[in-house]
């Protein structure tokens, strides 16, 4: 099985938790510690917000890695440095390096893809990485990083069956990317508890 087909075959293995992604990053030498990270979550608009933030950082002179999902045509769209998708030869080489560790840890598609992006950014010497949260926030693979900025675009009714059953429950999950003492931005027009992380 070719490397990309192997990665796609890991779809459907979703099981909430950060244990696998943290163990995978440890096996890879903690690439996520090589640069500052901004996490962008929310129900809608997080991809656009992540791309805009990456463009602002690039304009300011930073070498920027951008990780988004899903892709439109090509998987390589998800992992970009300076607006350019990861080259195919580098993608295949990193997948071959990642594969034995991901298999041993039974990592999911998104966990493996996230680790792949973080490793690529470290190898490419990025000065800042912008990561779009996949689903929710608290238990999302991107949340295995320690962000210097966390953004939640909004809190909506999408994915109530997974993150719900209420907007307050969704807000708690999305607020999971916030850290004490770390700048946080939120633009949530829907009613949200003032401190969703503390709501019973």
Language model region names:
Residues 37:
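Walker A (P-loop) ATP-phosphate-binding motif of ABC ATPase nucleotide-binding domains
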Residues 134-139, 146-200:
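Conserved catalytic-core segment of NTP-binding enzymes
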């Amino acid at each position: 099985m070719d490397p990309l087909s192997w990665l796609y075959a890991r779809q459907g293995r979703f099981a909430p938790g950060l244990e696998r992604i943290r163990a995978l990053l440890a096996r890879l030498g903690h690439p996520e510690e090589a640069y500052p990270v901004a996490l962008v979550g929310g129900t809608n608009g997080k991809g656009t917000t992540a791309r805009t933030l990456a463009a602002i950082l690039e304009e300011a002179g930073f070498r920027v890695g951008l990780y988004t999902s899903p892709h439109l045509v090509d998987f390589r769209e998800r992992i970009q440095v300076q607006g350019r998708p990861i080259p195919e030869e580098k993608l295949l080489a990193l997948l071959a390096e990642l594969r034995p560790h991901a298999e041993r840890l039974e990592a999911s598609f998104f966990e493996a893809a996230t680790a792949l992006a973080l490793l690529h950014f470290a190898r490419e010497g990025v000065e800042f990485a912008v990561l779009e949260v996949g689903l929710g926030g608290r238990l999302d693979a991107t949340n295995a990083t320690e962000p210097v900025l966390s953004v939640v675009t909004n809190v909506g009714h999408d994915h109530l069956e997974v993150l719900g059953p209420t907007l307050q429950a969704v807000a708690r999950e999305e607020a999971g990317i916030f850290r004490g003492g770390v700048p946080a931005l939120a633009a949530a027009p829907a009613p949200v508890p003032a401190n969703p992380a503390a709501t019973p």
